[in-house]
């Protein structure tokens, strides 16, 4: 079906709005497992820390895989087609997960959900690039701002909902809403599916693999996200409950602060660029230093038994640079040819989620060493101190690599 350019743009704008709704829940889904139900999985289903970490991190691995497997096709097949694939997978995985009790079935559902979530992001990014090419970074930041309020909803409000109706019913609701959003996309998609662009799909990827500055950026930024998401999705709420004996609502409120900061920072970046006179490296390097300071502050809080406010300060320091994904995307875009924008963002996101998954697994292994010392599922402070030693070393590596990322902006 051939439609006018004006109607095509209007339809794509409506589809983009539905994509933002999906991204709200894909962002929320990153921290749903284990997140608020860590203790439920531990006490109700008798999962070990390693199993809980595995069920949570499989989402991140498949999310990362989607960035390459689907990312290399995003510029050829168009945002709407990519969005349909991702939205369908994400919705199905989200709907079926609450009905599972076996760790293998849970893992399969989370794997499907993660792959779908990553594909939704690529479809959304491609749509934004098609509709707002000149203002790509700014509009992507706005979309991420809305999406990142998903984790905010997934903390205190969701904890209250779980207490009221149980975690299974509470976790079914996001899937039902996503099904409605997908229905809207299906109604609007006619005439918006672009014709496949011919060409060698893997050539841009091979070219990018040889781009040393791109990989310096990817690894340095990925370390930032790996550290942040260990707290957001794995142990942030639990370590506050365990070590400081705060109730689950106050603990989840602390994690909420992280989500709010990350959400807001996606649009603050443009203001920071003006202050830095367009310098990318100044902002990026300052971000890596904040992560190192945050990791060391968290280590001090557990090792020296400092106030919970010290740990919250550490969380805040870690959250600031984790909210700069739209900024990192600008650098990735500038380090590669314009026609490879979609793939550049995909490779950046792939790197981030590989490290998020790895850090999730490693956190489970580290806490597992103190399994025998855990009383009623509560880990000792030494376990969290060991975890923050690992995070601090990782943050130092991010700082070193960040110093090698070249400047791509203009003063």
Where do the PLM segments sit?
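Extracytoplasmic gate region of multi-pass secondary transporters
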Residues: 34-35, 212-269, 356-364
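Extracytoplasmic
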Residues: 15-49, 65, 70, 231-237, ...
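Conserved MFS/SLC helix-loop-helix module at the cytosolic interface between two early adjacent transmembrane helices
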Residues: 65-104
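Helix-loop-helix hairpin linking two adjacent transmembrane segments in secondary transporters
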Residues: 139-190
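Helix-breaking motifs and short loop linkers at transmembrane-helix boundaries and internal kinks
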Residues: 46, 78, 99-105, 116, ...
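Intracellular juxtamembrane helix-capping segments at the cytosolic ends
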Residues: 119-132, 323-337
């Amino acid at each position: 079906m051939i439609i006018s350019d004006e109607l095509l743009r209007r339809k794509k704008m409506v589809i983009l709005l539905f994509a933002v709704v999906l991204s709200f829940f894909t962002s929320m889904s990153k921290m749903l497992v284990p997140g608020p139900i860590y203790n439920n999985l531990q006490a109700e289903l008798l999962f070990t820390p390693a199993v809980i970490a595995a069920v949570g991190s499989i989402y991140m691995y498949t999310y990362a895989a989607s960035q390459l497997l689907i990312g290399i096709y995003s510029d050829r097949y168009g945002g709407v087609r990519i969005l349909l694939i991702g939205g369908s997978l994400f919705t199905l995985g989200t709907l079926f997960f609450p009905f599972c009790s076996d760790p293998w079935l849970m893992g399969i559902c989370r794997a499907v959900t993660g792959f779908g979530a990553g594909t939704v992001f690529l479809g959304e990014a491609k749509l934004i690039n098609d509709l707002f090419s000149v203002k790509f970074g700014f509009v992507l930041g706005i979309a991420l701002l809305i999406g990142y309020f998903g984790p905010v909803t997934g903390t205190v409000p969701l904890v209250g909902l779980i207490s009221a109706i149980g975690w299974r019913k509470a976790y079914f609701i996001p899937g039902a809403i996503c099904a409605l959003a997908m229905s809207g996309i299906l109604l609007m998609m006619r005439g918006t599916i672009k014709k496949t662009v011919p060409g060698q799909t893997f050539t841009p990827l091979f070219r990018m693999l040889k781009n040393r500055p791109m990989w310096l950026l990817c690894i340095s930024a990925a370390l930032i996200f790996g550290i942040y998401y260990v707290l957001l999705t794995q142990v942030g709420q639990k370590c506050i409950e365990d070590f400081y004996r705060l109730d689950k609502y106050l603990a989840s409120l602390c994690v909420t602060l992280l989500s709010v900061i990350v959400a807001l920072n996606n649009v603050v970046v443009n203001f920071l660029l003006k202050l830095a006179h367009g310098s990318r490296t100044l902002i990026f390097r300052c971000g890596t230093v904040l992560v190192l300071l945050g990791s060391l502050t968290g280590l001090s809080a557990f090792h020296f038994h400092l106030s919970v406010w010290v740990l919250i300060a550490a969380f805040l320091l870690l959250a600031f640079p984790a909210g700069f994904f739209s900024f990192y995307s600008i650098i990735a875009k500038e380090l590669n040819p314009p026609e490879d924008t979609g793939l550049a963002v995909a490779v950046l996101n792939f790197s981030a989620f590989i490290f998020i998954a790895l850090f999730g697994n490693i956190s489970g292994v580290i806490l597992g060493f103190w399994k025998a010392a855990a009383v009623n599922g509560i880990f000792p402070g030494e376990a969290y101190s060991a975890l923050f030693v690992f995070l601090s070393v990782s943050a130092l590596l991010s700082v070193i690599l960040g110093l090698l990322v070249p400047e791509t902006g203009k003063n």
